[in-house]
A protein has these predicted regions:
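Beta/coil-rich, acidic/histidine-enriched accessory regions frequently appended to metallopeptidases
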Residues: 39-42, 325-444, 462, 470-477, ...
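Exoplasmic/lumenal beta-rich domain surfaces
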Residues: 477-534, 572, 582-592, 596-614
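Intrinsically disordered, low-structural-confidence terminal and linker regions
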Residues: 36-85
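Juxtacatalytic substrate-recognition/specificity segment
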Residues: 127-256, 264-286
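Acidic/His/Gly-enriched intrinsically disordered linker/tail segments
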Residues: 197-199, 203-209, 226, 230-231, ...
Length: 654
């Protein structure tokens, strides 16, 4: 989705409303449970371990998370595992290519962003191109010439440009038809969207249109206009990216879709200004609301445009098909190309480029050749010293502090040493299970239990969750056939409401507890139907196409009837994690502190920080040799969206 509003209910859209509709048809492949599941638990209670509380800046959790590849959500496999249909769910719903005629009417499911609901709309087929069908909703006055004008732009410019740069969509796709369907009509809350739900059978999601298609809001982009064409360029990249790397981080996917608009000759709107007006916007995250997300569009687009200018088309286009996500994807394509730079190196130069925008400086690394950014917002400006200030900054976001005045100065910086992944503490002890987070992903935590000696059983555990409400869901499940199929179990706080079509049963969504922030709550699940035998228990976290929250955390898991108790302190205890991680919720906070010195020439120096995140730089001849200086402060810790606090003190040098 783009800032003009292309996307609903978690589709990938253009900004008017931001949802996450970018599902996947990538297969994970179902298999029998691994041998590790054979470890069963009977009636031996496990004592609580004595574990030291965290101190210092251990990177234990960071190293663990860096080694995890978050699994892609495979809806065909989910349909089989959750027994959504008595018959196998087909990947392609038509055995032969369908036929449509001009003037034909068809009913479509349209997503409504604000309510997460869908409604049916009737549209007439007004144009058939070599690669597209054009459907106009009944009740809207649109001339044939307008439709043909937009169709010509899509067929002659957008389709070949996007395919040449980003790759191919799934074709002939779910409907066995190589043409893409374009619906234009009442699409509330967004400019338009691509939603991967439509790439699947209705047996998986009842609101699927079972077609490769885009939805365009006619109130935001009428046929015959550049606005409609730019939205199609944006959404077509999403469609291609879904086929190549379905669970790519939203910020990468959206940045490339904004880049697709530029490659096709269209303006990206006000997203650049939205970011330069709010540079303390995390590049590697995404906003929950349209207002929050516009600056993220700007950040991700600028980073992609900078990357393209610096490394060229070949390396940039490799990002789409690269299976590694986010920063890891950049590192992978750079390494494969034999380049020494890595994501953090590029980010450091990008921070400078966003302030200076001088393409003639430092081999072009400190500016943009094809963009004119305008001024970036300054967080603070000083001209009298000494001065001391405390502030916070996002991860992979930046505060710019301008230093004016005269003389020689000393800058002292101190930042916090640790940061959390989620804004909680373990319910007991130090460790907890974390679902991990990602888009279009499927994380599981599984263990086998022996209930053969009891007639009833209860699964008890404490849970803390902050999940994208109505779009992403977590479940607890049971299997008696070795993990081939699973039954979703109800809990105290689960819901069966399913406005988006994403809830497979009794799911947790939104925030745990009744407060404004998530809280630990105790869940109890009846396992009595499985008493008398062995049962596999699984926690599963499923996310949709775009936007994700901190996730789902577990602690103090018990089945009292068999004497089982696990406070997560002593290790994995037989749990098999696929995407989940046993964490202490402590990451070492890292910072990037740079000083831009502007005079007859420009120089950038980086502050070295010690183990306590403290460092010092000197500024000489301010007001004489130097016109001014700019201190840039960025958080630089992956795997979290929590902000980092810091303090700087600037005083005249003795």
């Amino acid at each position: 989705m783009g800032p003009n509003g292309n996307r609903p209910g978690r589709p990938l859209a253009c900004v008017i409303g931001l949802l996450a509709f970018l599902a996947v048809v990538v297969g994970l492949g179902a298999a029998a449970l691994p041998a590790a599941y054979a470890q069963t638990v009977g009636g031996v209670p496990k004592p609580t371990a004595e574990v030291a509380q965290p101190g210092g800046t251990s990177d234990e959790t960071e190293r663990l998370l860096a080694a995890i590849q978050v699994p892609v959500r495979d809806r065909l496999d989910l349909a089989r595992r959750f027994r959504l249909s008595e018959e196998p769910v087909p990947a392609v719903v038509n055995s032969s290519r369908p036929s449509f005629t001009l003037g034909e009417k068809l009913s479509f499911w349209v997503g409504e962003t604000d309510t997460q609901r869908h409604f049916e709309a009737i549209a007439s087929l007004r144009y058939i191109g070599a690669h597209s069908y054009w459907w106009i909703q009944e009740g809207y006055d649109v001339r044939d010439e307008e439709v043909k004008a937009s169709a010509k732009v899509f067929e002659d410019r957008i389709y070949p440009t996007n395919r040449a740069f980003f790759g191919s969509e799934w074709s002939p796709g779910v409907d066995n038809d190589p043409r893409i369907h374009i619906f234009i009509g009442n699409v509330p809350g967004v400019g338009g969207y691509f939603y991967s739900v439509n790439e699947y059978s209705r047996l998986i999601n009842p609101y699927s249109n079972e077609k490769e298609m885009f939805f365009i809001n006619i109130e935001a982009a009428r046929p015959g206009t550049d606005n409609l064409a730019s939205i199609l360029a944006h959404e077509f990249q999403h469609m291609i990216h879904w086929r190549s790397d379905a669970n790519e981080d939203t910020w990468v996917n959206e940045g490339l879709s904004e880049l697709a608009m530029k490659l096709n000759g269209y303006n990206t709107g006000g997203v650049v200004t939205a970011f330069t007006s709010a540079p303390d916007t995390q590049l590697t995250a995404w906003g929950d609301t349209p207002d929050e997300s516009i600056a993220h569009y700007g950040a991700s687009y600028l980073f992609m445009a900078y990357f393209l200018e610096r490394f060229g088309e070949d390396i940039t286009r490799r990002l789409v098909a690269e299976p590694a996500n986010g920063a890891n994807g950049f590192n992978a394509v750079l390494e494969a190309a034999g380049r020494p730079e890595r994501f953090d190196d590029i980010f450091a130069d990008w921070v400078i480029a966003n302030y200076l925008d001088d393409p003639g400086a430092n081999q072009g690394y400190w500016g943009y050749t094809e963009l004119d950014l305008g001024p970036v917002k300054v967080d603070a400006e000083h001209s009298a010293y000494p001065v001391e200030r405390q502030a916070t900054v996002g991860q992979y976001a930046t505060d710019y502090v301008v230093l004016n005045g005269e003389g020689n100065l000393t800058i002292e910086f101190t930042g916090q040493r640790q940061v959390k992944i989620a804004a909680n503490a373990a319910h007991s002890g130090r460790y907890q299970w974390w679902s991990n987070r990602g888009d279009d992903s499927d994380m599981t935590l599984t263990r086998r239990f022996d209930l053969s000696e009891v007639k009833q059983a209860t699964l008890s555990f404490w849970v803390w969750y902050d999940i994208e409400e109505g779009w992403d869901y977590a479940y607890v499940e049971a299997s008696t056939d070795g993990g081939q199929t699973w039954h979703i179990l109800p809990g105290r706080y689960t819901t069966t409401e399913n406005r988006s079509g994403n809830n497979f049963g009794h799911g947790w969504t939104g925030r745990s507890g009744a407060g404004e922030t998530a809280e630990w709550v105790q869940e109890q699940v009846d396992l009595s139907p499985y008493a008398g035998g062995q049962v596999d228990i699984r926690f599963e976290y499923l996310t949709d196409d775009a936007v994700n929250r901190p996730g789902f955390l577990l602690d103090d898991i018990a089945i009292p009837e068999i004497g089982y108790w696990d406070d997560v302190e002593a290790g994995e205890d037989g749990w098999v994690a696929n995407g989940f991680a046993r964490i202490d919720n402590v990451l070492p906070q890292r910072y990037l502190v740079q000083l831009i010195e502007v005079g007859d020439s420009v120089r950038v120096r980086r502050m070295a920080l010690d183990a306590t995140n403290s460092g010092q730089l000197s500024v000489e001849d301010l007001g004489e040799r130097l016109d001014y200086a700019v201190l840039t402060i960025s958080g630089k810790t992956p795997f979290t969206t929590e902000t980092a606090s810091y303090t700087y003190r600037i005083y005249p040098a003795p």
